[in-house]
């Protein structure tokens, strides 16, 4: 993140915002700058990517599903806009430690004895490390002692759109992002790779809420895509993984996506449109939700 801060200082903060007497490496100035940069970056990334996904990827037929809430898109956006600043405050504390030199982030490929190969290995390691810890954090957030207060707001959206991707309780959002920030404190990682992965991870988070259930058949058993995550929203206690199905299989929480079996929400909408199913005006009761004509436990 110091690469971003350096650019922001050079082009904006130093010439236009802060007095010349306030050094760029002052910890309080860095904290303020990081808070601004993180919030602005988060909003730009969220609105740009989620909007593109909503208009060009998301299947709007899903909005006809009886579990799709009234004014849902507006509510998802409002929830996210209110949550992101609080998530950023917690995140900035870790960014500050990183730019103050407490992590193993570096900008010299020479620090990798095996060059590009080791760089690729670090990326793969990052993905598997974060996927493992996010699985257990996410699963822990479904525990009855914390679910209602922290994670339930994200499960309001049974048929999520890309705008639901970051609609978290701030503590929930921060906890699920924590493995990304912990990794470079344990393992060496190139700064550009770290920043790139941070952006890509946020785009991936949007993509698994986009309602596009297509995955190359050869990858379906391994990749935790939108079909898997939509079933997680619908069925509650399956498919906690972020990128891969590995830990769901190990933890006994893997569920083959209903969409792959022709029983997903799009199939439901199609049957409803053809008159084979009736449309329900409500969205279920307090503890149960309608899915594919049956009630399924959600909490």
UniProtKB/Swiss-Prot annotation:
Disorder noted: Lathosterolosis: An autosomal recessive disorder characterized by multiple congenital anomalies affecting axial and appendicular skeleton, liver, central nervous and urogenital systems, and lysosomal storage.
Annotated compartments: Endoplasmic reticulum membrane
Family membership noted in the UniProt record: Belongs to the sterol desaturase family.
Pathway(s) of this molecule: Steroid biosynthesis; cholesterol biosynthesis
Motif (Histidine box-2): 151-155
Signal peptide, first to last residue: none
Motif (Histidine box-1): 138-143
InterPro entries assigned to the protein according to its UniProt record, in alphabetical order: Fatty_acid_hydroxylase, Sterol_Desaturase_Related
Motif Histidine box-3 location, chain numbering: 228-233
GO MF terms held by the record: C-5 sterol desaturase activity; delta7-sterol 5(6)-desaturase activity; iron ion binding
The entry's keywords: Disease variant, Endoplasmic reticulum, Iron, Lipid biosynthesis, Lipid metabolism, Membrane, Oxidoreductase, Phosphoprotein, Steroid biosynthesis, Steroid metabolism, Sterol biosynthesis, Sterol metabolism, Transmembrane, Transmembrane helix
Taxonomic placement: Eukaryota, Metazoa, Chordata, Craniata, Vertebrata
Residue numbers carrying Phosphoserine: 253
Species assigned in the record: Homo sapiens
Segments passing through the bilayer: 32-52, 79-99, 117-137, 186-206
Protein name, UniProt field: Lathosterol oxidase
Biological processes annotated in GO: cholesterol biosynthetic process; cholesterol biosynthetic process via desmosterol; cholesterol biosynthetic process via lathosterol; negative regulation of ferroptosis
Catalyzed reaction equations: a Delta(7)-sterol + 2 Fe(II)-[cytochrome b5] + O2 + 2 H(+) = a Delta(5),Delta(7)-sterol + 2 Fe(III)-[cytochrome b5] + 2 H2O; lathosterol + 2 Fe(II)-[cytochrome b5] + O2 + 2 H(+) = 7-dehydrocholesterol + 2 Fe(III)-[cytochrome b5] + 2 H2O; 5alpha-cholesta-7,24-dien-3beta-ol + 2 Fe(II)-[cytochrome b5] + O2 + 2 H(+) = 7-dehydrodesmosterol + 2 Fe(III)-[cytochrome b5] + 2 H2O
């Amino acid at each position: 993140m110091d690469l971003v801060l350096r650019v922001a200082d050079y082009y904006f903060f130093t010439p236009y915002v802060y007095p010349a007497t306030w050094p760029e490496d002052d910890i309080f100035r860095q904290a303020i700058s990081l808070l601004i940069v993180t919030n602005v970056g988060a909003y730009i990334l969220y609105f740009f990517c989620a909007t593109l996904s909503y208009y060009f990827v998301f299947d709007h037929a899903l909005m006809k599903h009886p579990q799709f809430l009234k004014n849902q898109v507006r509510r998802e956006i409002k929830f996210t806009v209110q949550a992101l600043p609080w998530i950023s405050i917690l995140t900035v504390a870790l960014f500050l430690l990183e730019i103050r030199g407490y992590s193993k982030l570096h900008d010299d490929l020479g620090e990798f004895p095996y060059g590009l190969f080791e760089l690729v290995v670090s990326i793969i390691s990052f993905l598997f490390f974060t996927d493992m810890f996010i699985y257990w954090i996410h699963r822990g957030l479904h525990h009855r002692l914390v679910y209602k207060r922290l994670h339930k707001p994200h499960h309001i959206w049974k048929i999520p759109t890309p705008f639901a991707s970051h609609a978290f309780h701030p503590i929930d959002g921060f906890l699920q992002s924590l493995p990304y920030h912990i990794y470079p404190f344990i393992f060496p990682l190139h700064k550009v790779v770290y920043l790139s992965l941070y952006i890509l991870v946020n785009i991936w988070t949007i993509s698994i809420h986009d309602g596009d259930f297509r995955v190359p058949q050869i990858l379906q058993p391994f990749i935790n895509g939108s079909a898997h995550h939509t079933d997680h929203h619908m069925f509650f206690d399956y498919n906690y993984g972020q990128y891969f199905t590995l830990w769901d299989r190990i933890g006994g929480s893997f569920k083959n996506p209903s969409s792959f079996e022709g029983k997903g929400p799009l199939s439901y909408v199609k049957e409803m449109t053809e008159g084979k199913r009736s449309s329900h005006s409500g969205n279920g009761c307090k503890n149960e939700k309608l899915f594919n004509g049956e009630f399924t436990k959600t909490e």
